[in-house]
């Protein structure tokens, strides 16, 4: 359910952004690992309600509560943001709406979505870059989920920490990952490029993963955890923003967002199976699988970048128009 909601949220957010502005959503993924060890809830309450269930119950209740509040406060699409009703808060004046709509229209000419047509919607799946972005995202979530699922086990069985210490040591790498996300989002906006940060994260993964798996020093291995965790999690907003900058048309963008989320789930399945307890303490097969994913991120990103660079060069020379819009250029 939340996966389908996530793709819808992406489609809405990216409808508000213009490629020239290069606004990046700042994503902060700070996970509090100690809550997995001893959440502040009763051991049990009622028939079948163990304490760990409250983690999911509380998250579900908060999601519903925020969704109900958001129904009123979340801003509508740009062209509708000046309207108000009993269920929708007015956010902009009409002159502000006109300015924003004009800016987005000048950038990509897709403020108002075309009438939905299944054939045209599915036609977007024939675009190779849609699957290129999906493959990069799948490789990224392979590493993301692998670390999220197995980091406590790696810290405990692979590095010798106690269960309590292992759960406490989960949080710092995610705090660091949040900082890296913010820095890369700012740099992407400042220099108006996206792919270098995707490649940078792939390189960080290729440095951090072997350190995490093969170094003899526990300190060096834990430092590798910081690099690998930052690389995997910081790459998520980089890829989402890069694909949004290079996909034109609301229905095609919706298809691409859904494809990314779906392939991200596939990456989660892969990441959830590569680390096995019998491979302790170094977990060599899992580390190698994640390193292959990091290398694939770099390779596919370079291939997409080459495609975009050649298309921009051809369009600048008066050749084939990109995405059916004169003046549109791919973001590298």
Feature annotation, model-predicted:
Residues 196-211:
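Structural signature of the two symmetry-related core transmembrane helices
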Residues 116-186, 236, 240-241, 271-272:
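Extracytoplasmic gate region of multi-pass secondary transporters
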Residues 7-10, 234-249:
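Intracellular juxtamembrane helix-capping segments at the cytosolic ends
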Residues 17-20, 242-254, 280-281:
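Paired intracellular helix-loop junctions of major facilitator superfamily
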Residues 219-242, 260-261:
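Hydrophobic core of transmembrane alpha-helices in multi-pass small-molecule transporters
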Residues 14, 187, 277-278:
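Hydrophobic alpha-helical transmembrane and interfacial-helix anchor sites in secondary transporters
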Residues 15-34, 39-121, 285, 290-291, ...:
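Central mid-sequence intracellular linker of multi-pass
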Residues 250-283, 289-293:
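A late C-terminal transmembrane helix in Major Facilitator Superfamily
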């Amino acid at each position: 359910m939340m996966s389908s909601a996530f793709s819808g949220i992406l489609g809405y957010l990216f409808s508000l952004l213009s490629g020239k502005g290069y606004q990046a959503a700042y994503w902060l993924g700070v996970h509090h690992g100690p809550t997995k060890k001893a959440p502040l809830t009763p051991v049990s309450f009622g028939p079948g309600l163990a304490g760990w269930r409250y983690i999911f119950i509380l998250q579900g209740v908060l999601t519903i509560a925020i969704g109900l509040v958001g129904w009123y406060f979340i801003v509508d699409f740009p062209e509708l943001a000046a309207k108000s009703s009993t269920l929708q808060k007015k956010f902009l004046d009409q002159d502000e709406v006109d300015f924003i709509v004009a800016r987005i229209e000048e950038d990509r000419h897709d403020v108002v979505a075309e009438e939905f047509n299944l054939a045209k919607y599915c036609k977007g799946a024939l675009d190779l870059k849609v699957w290129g972005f999906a493959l990069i995202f799948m490789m990224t979530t392979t590493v993301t989920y692998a670390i999220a699922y197995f980091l406590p086990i790696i810290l405990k069985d692979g590095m010798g920490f106690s269960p309590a210490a292992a759960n406490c040591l989960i949080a710092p790498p995610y705090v660091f990952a949040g900082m890296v996300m913010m820095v890369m989002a700012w740099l992407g906006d400042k220099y108006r490029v996206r792919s270098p940060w995707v490649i940078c994260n792939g390189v960080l993964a290729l440095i951090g993963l072997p350190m995490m798996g093969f170094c003899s020093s526990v300190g060096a291995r834990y430092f590798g955890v910081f690099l690998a965790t930052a690389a995997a999690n910081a790459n998520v907003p980089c890829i989402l923003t890069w694909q949004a900058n290079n996909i034109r048309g609301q229905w095609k963008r919706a298809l691409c967002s859904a494809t990314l989320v779906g392939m991200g789930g596939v990456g989660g399945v892969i990441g959830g199976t590569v680390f096995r307890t019998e491979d302790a303490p170094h977990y060599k097969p899992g580390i190698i699988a994640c390193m292959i994913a990091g290398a694939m991120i770099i390779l596919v990103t370079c291939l997409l970048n080459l495609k975009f660079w050649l298309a921009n060069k051809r369009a600048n020379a008066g050749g084939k128009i990109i995405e059916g819009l004169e003046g549109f250029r791919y973001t590298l």
